[in-house]
Curated annotation (Swiss-Prot):
Keyword Ion transport: no
Organism of provenance: Human T-cell leukemia virus 1 (isolate Melanesia mel5 subtype C) (HTLV-1)
Residue ranges of the motif Nuclear localization signal 3: 136-140
Family designation: Belongs to the HTLV-1 HBZ protein family.
Annotated protein name in UniProt: HTLV-1 basic zipper factor
Taxonomic classification: Viruses, Riboviria, Pararnavirae, Artverviricota, Revtraviricetes
Length: 208
């Protein structure tokens, strides 16, 4: 979610919500902790490898010094194998943790992308509605202006012809419109008759 802070009379700046800041802080903390754990694991593995190398070298040269014999036939190779298995399990656990963090970051990026798309869609919708409102006002203004011009023209005509003359002119225009309407109705009837004629002929051809 994005809030806006007004700066000056006509501008506003986006300000991230506290929830987004909290999520970003948590992610930064997780990444920092992950880096520290990796460094610690690498240091432990390095120390363990060094100890095992020294033990193996000492065993090959002098045998185990200052140590008891491996219990019940356990050899140093067995201990080395167990240490390697332990390191392997650690690596697998690290991979799983990295996978979970990557999935979390992926979901976070997808959510942020969805929020950006929604914000863009809302902005486009607001711009479209604003444009439609401006066009509606423009049409209304033109209609009002045109109506005012028509009323002014009728008033001037009435003044010029007088009430009786203007009334006779309106009657003449009404008769002309009625005659035009009758002509259009007759043309429509003629067209419908022709359509019906050809439709009957087609039906007769299909029925044969």
């Amino acid at each position: 979610m994005i809030n806006f802070v007004f700066v000056g009379p006509f501008r506003c700046l986006p300000v991230p919500c506290p929830e987004d800041l909290l999520v970003e802080d948590l992610v930064d903390g997780l990444l920092s902790l992950e880096d520290e754990l990796k460094d610690q694991r690498e240091e432990e593995e390095s120390v363990l490898d060094g100890v095992l190398s020294l033990e193996e070298e000492s065993r090959l040269r002098w045998g185990p010094v200052g140590e008891e014999a491996p219990p019940r036939g356990e050899t140093h190779r067995d201990r080395q194998r167990r240490a390697e298995e332990k390191r392997k399990r650690k690596r697998e656990r690290e991979k799983e943790e990295e996978k979970q963090i990557a999935e979390f970051l992926k979901r976070k990026r997808e959510k942020e992308a969805w929020r950006r798309r929604r914000a863009e869609e809302k902005a486009a919708d607001r711009a479209r509605r604003k444009l439609e409102e401006e066009e509606r006002r423009e049409r209304k203004w033109r209609q009002t202006e045109q109506g005012a011009k028509q009323r002014s023209a009728r008033k001037e005509k009435m003044t010029e012809l007088g009430v009786d003359g203007y009334a006779r002119q309106l009657e003449s225009e009404a008769e002309s419109l009625e005659a035009e309407r009758g002509r259009l109705l007759q043309e429509n009837d003629d067209l419908m008759g022709e359509v019906n004629y050809w439709q009957r002929r087609l039906e007769a051809m299909w029925s044969q």
